[in-house]
């Protein structure tokens, strides 16, 4: 228990009880589920949430036909961000965010996308598990204004000591990128309720982790 509380302090940067984190997760899951129902209704789908997920997994319109198509769609989202980012972020890094596919030797075991200083990697392996309706949220999280911009800007702040420019603090690093997914709504980047639903799917992943992590490691599930 003491070690788990230490891990919470490290990753959350606050002395929160596991029970409080668990309760927050449950509340977020309930809230996001309600928002998912709203987004689903806006698509015109008339079934249950489970049936909607099955529909999204099986309808070919939600998946790229080629690696090139997936990369082009990601590039288009990045270009749209470039056109509006100055209205939302006051100080931008000099380093642009470059788009590349995940290398072939890594792709089968890699995440859907990964962002670093001035870099956005998109996984084009096994396209039937890379839904296009989550691509705007993924791109906002990993590229700009997410990790790709966030880390590039931190590295350019030369007046700060190295430990502040290069140290990874999960609460800040991932918290900022998660906020960027939400910011996409304000930026007008979710064109359809399907894409807004994709953003909510990403939010739901994080909420479920709060519940499952504390359930396994503290509540003896």
What are these regions (language model features)?
Residues 1-221:
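N-terminal maturation segment of proteins
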């Amino acid at each position: 228990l003491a070690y788990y509380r230490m891990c919470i302090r490290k990753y959350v940067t606050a002395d929160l009880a596991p029970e409080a984190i668990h309760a927050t997760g449950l509340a977020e899951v309930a809230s996001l589920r309600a928002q998912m129902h709203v987004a689903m209704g806006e698509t015109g789908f008339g079934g249950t949430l489970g049936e909607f997920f099955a529909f999204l997994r099986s309808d070919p319109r939600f998946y790229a036909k080629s690696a090139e198509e997936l990369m082009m769609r990601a590039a288009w989202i990045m270009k749209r961000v470039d056109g509006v980012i100055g209205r939302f972020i006051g100080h931008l890094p000099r380093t642009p965010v470059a788009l590349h596919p995940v290398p072939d030797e890594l792709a089968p075991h890699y995440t859907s996308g990964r962002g670093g200083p001035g870099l956005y990697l998109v996984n084009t392996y096994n396209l039937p598990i890379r839904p296009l309706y989550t691509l705007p949220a993924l791109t906002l999280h990993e590229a700009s204004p997410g990790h790709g911009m966030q880390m590039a800007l931190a590295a350019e702040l030369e007046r700060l000591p190295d430990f502040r420019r290069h140290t990874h603090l999960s609460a800040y690093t991932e918290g900022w990128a998660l906020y960027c997914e939400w910011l996409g709504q304000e930026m007008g980047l979710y064109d359809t309720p399907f894409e807004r639903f994709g953003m909510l799917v990403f939010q739901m992943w994080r909420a479920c982790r709060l519940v499952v992590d504390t359930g396994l490691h503290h509540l003896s599930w």
